[in-house]
Amino acid sequence: MADDSLLLNFSLGDNNIIQPETKLKGGTWRDRLSAKKIAKHHAKGPRTAGDEDSAPRAPRNPNRIEVPSSRPTKRQRTDGGDSGKQQSHGHPHSNQPRQFISSLFTKNPEPQKAEEVKEEGHVENAKPTNAPLIDGLDTFTNLGLSPNLAAHLLTKLELKAPTAIQKASISQLLKEEGDAFIQAETGSGKTLAYLLPLVQRIMALSKPGAQTDATGQPIVHRDSGLFAIVLAPTRELCKQISVVLENLLRCAHWIVAGTVIGGEKKKSEKARLRKGLNILVATPGRLADHLDNTQALDVSNVRWLVLDEGDRLMELGFEEEIQGIVKKLDARQRPSRIPGIPARRTTILCSATLKMSVQKLGEISLKDAVHIKADPEDEDEKARRSKAEESAYRVPAQLKQSYAVVAAKLRLVTLTAFFKRTFMRKGSVMKAIIFVSCADSVDFHFEVFTRKQVKEDGGEPSDTDKSEEKPPSSPHGTIAPATAFSNPSNPVTLFRLHGSLPQNVRTSTLGAFAKNKEASVLICTDVASRGLDLPNVDLVVEYDPAFSAEDHLHRIGRTARVGRDGRALIFLQPGCEENYVEVLKRGYRDGGKALTRADANEILKRGFGGNVESGNKDWETKATDWQCEVERWALENPEYLEMARRAFQSHIRAYATHIAAERSMFNIKELHLGHLAKAFALRDRPSKINVPGLRQGKEETKKDFKAERNSAAGKKRKAGGADLADDIPSANNTATAAQKMRAKMKEHMAGANEFNLA
């Protein structure tokens, strides 16, 4: 052809040169497509300088794919105009772990249900439903108790009149010898309701006079045998029953009581059993063990068996143990030579609720039992109700209960602000209990509230401040001053309690909290929610909602006991948890009119010193500073950071264990894990905390797969082309390495410019 040797030389501008398309490798086709679009976007011409609205935005690149820059144009710029402003579109710090510090007061979900916020002072005081009777005729003597025991109750225990359930049960159990089921609300005195008839009957067996031996001593003494057994679900409840029983038996010193519970040495328990006991308080597991392995335990004379907290006994899985205990007591029962002792055994079942599990326990242990309630006049009305309504729990009428809808990020600061306000004035509240869901959360919050505080000026506490904040002696680390919400005029002591602590530590901590005369707070799990009668508890805070409505009843039942006033507050999160308010209302006789709502912002304002009436936002700054200080404290101490992560993980696992009927209100899929992590002073992404039991999302699974694939491909390339890596010299620091890399790139670019046309 004639035109084969034709050469054309066109003069084109820099902007008209068609640059070769950059080929992207690695990743999925979706990622390559998005990276290709990003490259085309940057290949467009620059925007006008005066167009502020068209300022380029940072491209969204969640997978952080490095987009290679385009090849240089025909000639390099030598004027140095805007070359220094060009920045790499990659992420230079992508290999370093990123921490995100989110604001406390932004992007928080709003409550779905807007209700009127009532002040607690506007709530009418209700008549106590579990208080002692004020009628002068209803005394312990009129119920059938001996004058000696009634006088002991009046003078030593300062009990002037019985409660409604005590009046109904004492008269019934002293009059008849049949089985009984005692049902009453929490804090109404059920322990004395069955202990007083028990002690009265054993005292009648040993009454001086005709029933004495040759020396004039009562026939019944510690060697006479075991007459009564009291079973309780927890060790703490057994200890409390034992203390009440010992106080009662001070008027009958010849009757001996003892305990056998888990966590103590069996050798010492066997020694006590060999010496002889008349009344035994035990946990089901340890009693079943002694019945099988201890020959000194003689149960042939046992005529009274009490099952306290029957619903909890079934929830903890003691059905088989109790069934075995009842069978062994029936098989080993023998006629007694002691005059006046009943021919058959009397079984008493106590429970605040009447659930199917309690009914099943009654079928195992009770025979023709009488149902004892505090309000017998309402029996006909209750009989017409359905079974679900029969088993509904009731809250003491004098208990002032409220709830606060708090966003996940604000939970920790709101709890701190609430107790700052609570203990601002000395004497307003003496004792309070905080219930959380798991033991790891107890340990973390205990360390947060007892850590060394940083002054507002940023300095460390002085020696005088340290001397004023000396904690009480606690060799086990369960007692410390609550520096987070103490003040110079009202120091507060913090106690911690959970089931993972050794038994001796749990007993000593609980005893120290009960005996403390100053302001104190107990942070604990549900191990302290059942049956414990802790004196002067004015406030109960459910920081984590209970796993069932019955557990909620027992939690708030630690206050407002035996006619005393009490307050309770529960924390709920916006969303599906707000439906739990209807469950709370069902526990009231008036349909929940006494249930009030507390505003979370008002709690923060009052706690962090802001003026509620004005629009000043100083309280937000103080709350944010306090939260950031806790987060820095956790980051600076690896031990506490690991403790926070464990608490977060355990909290998520515990959140998924709500009962099936309430799981729609506590849906783990609707939890914002990132916001919730901030309540544990964590700045890590939840995906990096590795929460066991949670499935990874699609994006996280895809990232993990690509990371493994890229690492494997990198190893292959490194094995096959190790000599290429030697072209880039190594450096000791990042700055030197970057400088040498730029020099290497200039060499490659200089070689490419030699082949430019024109």
Curated annotation (Swiss-Prot):
Main localization of the protein described in the UniProt heading: nucleus
Keyword set, alphabetical order: ATP-binding, Helicase, Hydrolase, Nucleotide-binding, Nucleus, Ribosome biogenesis, RNA-binding, rRNA processing
Recorded catalytic activity of this chain's protein: ATP + H2O = ADP + phosphate + H(+)
Positions with biased composition (Polar residues): 84-98
Binding-site residues for ATP, renumbered to this chain: 184-191
Motif Q motif mapped to chain: 138-167
UniProt xrefs under InterPro entries: DEAD/DEAH_box_helicase_dom (IPR011545), Helicase_ATP-bd (IPR014001), Helicase_C-like (IPR001650), P-loop_NTPase (IPR027417), SPB4-like_CTE (IPR025313)
Entry's EC annotation: 3.6.4.13
Motif (DEAD box): 308-311
Domain Helicase C-terminal: 398-620
Location of the Helicase ATP-binding domain: 171-372
UniProt record similarity statement: Belongs to the DEAD box helicase family. DDX31/DBP7 subfamily.
Remaining remarks: Present with 1460 molecules/cell in log phase SD medium.
Protein name (Swiss-Prot/TrEMBL): ATP-dependent RNA helicase dbp7
